């Protein structure tokens, strides 16, 4: 990574560094739109690309990464387990095929469907197999975090949640920090539905 990129990272509990800024691929159509989004982001200096099985664009993301010329060790790739499926490790193996990668840097449970704990052993297994460098969660509450932590051999490194000035979840942030879990925000500037851009204070910032 460049010195500018290295200055904008957080260190996870396992020592891995995660770039603070990522390109999120939610609602980006598969095909040329997704490929161009990734390509242009990498040209602008982004090194963290965040996708998911349910986004349906992993193949295009992988194609753009392969064509970018950016060395793999300078990229940080996140994907997510769809908890309507059964086996996190097997699903990640399929994700890797679509992405054209040997591993991802971060693998998250996309949401706590069917309870917060059942999928975690499979996430730990994916880590043991070398399919991912780090594992974590998305959209988990404090109570769900604590249920999982009582049963986990490897604690989650990340909890990715909606977090913005209009959705400032202080209790979740403080509880996660106390447990050594990095909170990663999606929609950090809000979404079109919450009229973030119409707030004068936000516009001044």
Residue map of PLM features:
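N-terminal binding-site loop/beta-alpha segment at the start of enzyme catalytic domains
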Residues: 1-75, 89, 189-192
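Generic structural signal for well-ordered alpha-helices
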Residues: 7, 38, 58, 62-65, ...
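Short, well-ordered coil/turn segments that N-cap beta-strands
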Residues: 16-21, 45-48, 70-75, 101-105, ...
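Conserved, mostly hydrophobic/aromatic
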Residues: 23, 41, 49, 61, ...
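Short, acidic/polar
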Residues: 29-42, 85-100, 116-118, 143-146, ...
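A short, structured active-site edge motif that brings together acidic residues
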Residues: 72-85, 105-112, 139-142
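CE4/NodB-like, metal-dependent polysaccharide N-deacetylase domain
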Residues: 88-109, 125-129, 150-151, 181
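Beta/alpha (TIM)-barrel catalytic core signal, keyed to glycine-rich beta->alpha loops juxtaposed to Asp/Glu
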Residues: 112-205
